């Protein structure tokens, strides 16, 4: 039901489960290598892990780098934190009466049970719910970042089990790019956000101006969907050394802007006004005759309709630089200068994703493509636009060699009965609370009327929805509705503390796996070797679902595993990659030798791929290489969207003022920016020692402009209460001139820690609005919120976010 990021990006490899093989000669499950160093990997790259006496004592990056990655130091914290779930647990009220628990989720104590008891209880209630309500009542979308690896993919393994059981309700899209990945196929014929970018060597050689629009790669390139190849940061370092001018458009002076120093010009518009700023630039280009009419005529459709809007012919409002300045807070002269600079130089517009995680977020990337089209540089070396330079090292040229396939939710030789009777469904990922609140409700999505399933059971594996979903208090209320909620987790997250049944799962350091580095480059294959024994009673997801499959039917375990254990699957994946490498005339060692060598494999560079230009073929021949849009061209005006008739997503890029922004704020309200943190992967590692690098008064920091802080009597280091109609949080003040006046920043990902309505840890999503971006994409809009702030003068409550819950003996 779910198309993953990796599947968007990867166009090679084979489906897992097509062939049954037996294990090769036995290999050690884990071992302390020479010097106690074991090679493994995580989202934050290949790592050498040091083990002493069965415990991880340190971890360091395994790849050479110029810019250090703090996340690579966290292996010991991940395995040995006191936040680990140690045993299978069941909520007491649920254990007493699964059909009618006396207490609500989040209000109960837990009882330790055996694995056998836990799995039996899950199986019995799962079967009951499925038989009574059908497969659509089982939600197994289970969105989240999980751990790296091609085998131990929590979400996929869950869905593999649910397919064997008869189907489930899943999700579509993701929280990262939910708006863009739905609008972009209408504009350029692909999701775009997960496509390879024009190569970095061509950027460095040909780009004269680089615009970083709402992106902070110094933070976001510490990670990747598989494992970072670490080259993106190296290329940004080379860009800095080149001295090329960088324009950074962002309400906050990010780590990236600080990194570029004097090379960077920082422009700080009012939050949520990016479309208006782009329109002002576009209007200036048009009035000065600097828009590329030839490109617009040959490669796009619908520009004349858009120009009527731009000039004000259609609505009596010219989108001039003066009009833009009033909305954005960016001076008119600077807007004009921006337009002239972009037109006079080979300009690469690099955009992040935060700007589309807003109400009407679909308009942001659409308008940026339109601006790039007006400049006429799309498909040229170093020109045009790119939406993935900040993610997974987009632009690092794709290597030639083997590509690892991955575990599939489909089982060889098995077809889900639900697929035949219409029982499989998917809801937009950020509309889970809407679905729980409105079972059977109708909603519009991408031109079609859809129906929410009546969800009775939820299983979440490898994700933390209580941190990544908006409006936490609304989520908690909706979370009471299902009859059973199971969470498979390594840690006592807020989601785990609101589950009926909690299963302790291994970290990636307690099992064996494989991964690629570089979602675009496929640069390395890395052995993810088990470093330590499973902690406490933790088990692998693969083994948990295999056991549950046996409870479904005799022989279910054999069907689920396809007769392969952990090492046999890894050999199967590796052998497939080796076969692909051989076809490319790249030599890889045999699997046993590779595994025992404790070394990664680097694939061969490709001179052809180093010259890759996004949309280069389209520019060379737009007929032969037509885009996947109805016209085959870039669609500035979409007749498809015109037919949809959505007022919140018109047929061309449009400035639509959000419900909560500077223009609707009272004199005491500030706009809330929820940026990506420097020392976490979203909510992952919130418990780690890295917390000492950023926490203020042991809380999530809030960045406040100097003048705003003075106005509210707040000093650096003070505790600050932040609130609105949705909730309240406690934060620690960081006072600076490095943020737009009228904007505060609380980085996303802090674990919710609620007591008497106050989140003691400072989770931003307690404050954000759970509204759809529009009827088109129904994506999250976490960057559209207004808040109040005040100095907190009460006694600071004890932080309990990382504590074990109360357990009844």
Swiss-Prot record:
InterPro entries the UniProt entry points to: Asp_de-COase-like_dom_sf (IPR009010), BisC (IPR006658), CT_DMSOR/BSOR/TMAOR (IPR041954), Molybdopterin_N (IPR041460), MoPterin_dinucl-bd_dom (IPR006657), Mopterin_OxRdtase (IPR006656), Mopterin_OxRdtase_prok_CS (IPR006655), Prok_Mopterin_Oxidored (IPR050612)
Region forming the signal peptide: 1-31
SUPFAM superfamilies: ADC-like, Formate dehydrogenase/DMSO reductase, domains 1-3
Disulfide bonds: none
Subcellular location(s) per record: Periplasm
Cofactor: Mo-bis(molybdopterin guanine dinucleotide)
GO terms assigned for molecular function: electron transfer activity; molybdenum ion binding; molybdopterin cofactor binding; trimethylamine-N-oxide reductase (cytochrome c) activity
GO BP of this protein: anaerobic respiration
Cofactor stoichiometry and binding remark: Binds 1 molybdenum-bis(molybdopterin guanine dinucleotide) (Mo-bis-MGD) cofactor per subunit.
Sites where the protein binds Mo-bis(molybdopterin guanine dinucleotide): 176
EC number, UniProt record: 1.7.2.3
Gene3D superfamilies linked to this entry: 2.40.40.20, 3.40.50.740, Dimethylsulfoxide Reductase, domain 2, Dimethylsulfoxide Reductase, domain 3
Pfam families: Molybdopterin, Molybdopterin_N, Molydop_binding
Cellular component GO terms held in the UniProt record: outer membrane-bounded periplasmic space
Further remark: Expression of torYZ allows E.coli to grow anaerobically on a wider range of substrates than does expression of torCAD.
Family: Belongs to the prokaryotic molybdopterin-containing oxidoreductase family.
Identification of the protein by name: Trimethylamine-N-oxide reductase 2
Organism this protein belongs to: Escherichia coli O157:H7
Gene this protein is translated from: torZ
């Amino acid at each position: 039901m779910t198309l993953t990021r990796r599947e968007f990006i990867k166009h090679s490899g084979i489906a897992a489960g097509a062939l049954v093989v037996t294990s090769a000669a036995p290999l050690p499950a884990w071992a302390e290598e020479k010097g106690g160093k074991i090679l493994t990997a995580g989202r934050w790259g290949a790592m050498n892990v040091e083990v002493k006496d069965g415990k991880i004592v340190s971890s360091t990056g395994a790849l050479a780098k110029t810019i250090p990655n703090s996340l690579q130091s966290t292996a010991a914290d991940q395995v040995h934190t006191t936040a680990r779930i140690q045993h299978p647990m069941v909520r007491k009220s649920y254990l007493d009466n699964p059909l009618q628990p006396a207490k609500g989720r989040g209000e109960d104590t837990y009882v330790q049970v055996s694995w056998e008891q836990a799995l039996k209880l899950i199986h019995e209630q799962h079967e009951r719910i499925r038989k009574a309500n059908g497969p659509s009542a089982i939600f197994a979308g289970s969105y989240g970042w999980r751990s790296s690896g091609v085998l131990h993919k929590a979400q996929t393994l869950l869905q593999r089990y649910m397919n064997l059981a008869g189907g489930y309700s899943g999700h579509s899209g993701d929280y990262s790019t939910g708006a863009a990945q739905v609008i972009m196929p209408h504009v350029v014929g692909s999701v775009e956000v997960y496509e390879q970018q024009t190569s970095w060597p061509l950027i460095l050689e040909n780009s004269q101006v680089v615009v970083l629009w709402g992106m902070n790669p110094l933070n976001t390139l510490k990670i990747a969907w598989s494992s970072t190849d670490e080259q993106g940061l190296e290329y940004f370092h080379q860009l800095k050394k080149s001295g090329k001018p960088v324009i950074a458009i962002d309400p906050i002076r990010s780590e990236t802007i600080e990194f570029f120093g004097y090379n960077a010009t920082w422009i700080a518009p009012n939050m949520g006004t990016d479309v208006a700023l782009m329109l002002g630039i576009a209007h200036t280009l048009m009035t000065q005759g600097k828009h590329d009419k030839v490109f617009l005529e040959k490669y796009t459709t619908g520009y004349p309709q858009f120009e009527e809007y731009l000039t004000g012919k259609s609505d009596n409002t010219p989108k001039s630089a003066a009009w833009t300045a009033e909305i954005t807070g960016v001076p008119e002269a600077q807007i004009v200068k921006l337009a002239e600079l972009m037109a006079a130089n080979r300009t690469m517009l690099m955009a992040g994703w935060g700007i589309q995680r807003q109400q009407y977020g679909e308009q942001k990337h659409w308008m940026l493509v339109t601006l790039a089209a007006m400049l006429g540089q799309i498909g040229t070396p170093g020109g045009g636009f790119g939406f993935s330079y900040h993610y997974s090292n987009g632009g690092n040229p794709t290597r030639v060699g083997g590509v690892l396939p991955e575990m599939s939710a489909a089982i060889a030789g098995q077809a889900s009965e639900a697929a035949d009777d219409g029982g499989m469904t998917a809801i937009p990922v950020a509309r889970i609370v809407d679905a729980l609140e409105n079972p059977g409700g109708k909603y519009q999505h991408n031109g079609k009327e859809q129906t929410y399933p009546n969800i009775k059971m939820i299983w979440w594996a490898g994700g933390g929805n209580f941190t990544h979903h908006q409006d936490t208090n609304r989520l908690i209320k909706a979370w009471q509705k299902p009859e059973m909620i199971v969470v498979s987790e390594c840690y006592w997250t807020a989601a785990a503390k609101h589950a009926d049944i909690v299963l302790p799962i291994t970290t990636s350091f307690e099992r064996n796996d494989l991964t690629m580095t570089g979602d675009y480059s496929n640069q390395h294959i890395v052995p993810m070797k088990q470093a330590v024994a499973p902690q406490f009673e933790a088990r692998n997801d693969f083994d948990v679902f295999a056991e549950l499959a046996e409870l479904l039917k005799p022989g279910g375990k054999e069907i689920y595993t396809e007769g392969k254990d952990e090492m046999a699957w890894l050999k199967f994946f590796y052998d497939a990659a080796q076969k692909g490498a051989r076809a490319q005339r790249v030599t890889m060692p045999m699997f046993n030798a590779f595994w025992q060598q404790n070394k990664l494999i680097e694939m061969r560079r490709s001179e052809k791929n180093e010259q890759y230009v996004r949309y280069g073929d389209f520019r060379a021949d737009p007929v032969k290489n037509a885009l996947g849009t109805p016209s085959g061209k870039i669609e500035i005006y979409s007749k498809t969207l015109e037919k949809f008739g959505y007022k919140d997503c018109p047929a061309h890029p449009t400035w639509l003022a959000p419900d909560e922004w500077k223009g609707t704020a009272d004199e005491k309200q500030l706009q809330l920016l929820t940026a990506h943190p420097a020392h976490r992967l979203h909510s992952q590692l919130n418990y780690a020692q890295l917390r000492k690098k950023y926490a203020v008064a042991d809380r999530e920091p809030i960045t406040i402009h100097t003048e705003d802080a003075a106005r509210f009597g707040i000093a650096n280091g003070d505790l600050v209460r932040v609130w609105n109609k949705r909730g309240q949080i406690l934060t620690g003040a960081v006072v600076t001139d490095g943020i737009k006046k009228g904007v505060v920043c609380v980085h996303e990902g802090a674990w919710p820690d609620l007591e008497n309505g106050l989140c003691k840890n400072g989770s931003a999503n307690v404050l954000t609005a759970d509204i759809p971006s529009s009827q088109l994409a129904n994506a999250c809009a976490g960057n559209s919120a207004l808040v109040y702030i005040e100095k907190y003068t009460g006694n600071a409550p004890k932080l309990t976010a990382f504590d074990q819950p109360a357990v009844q003996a």
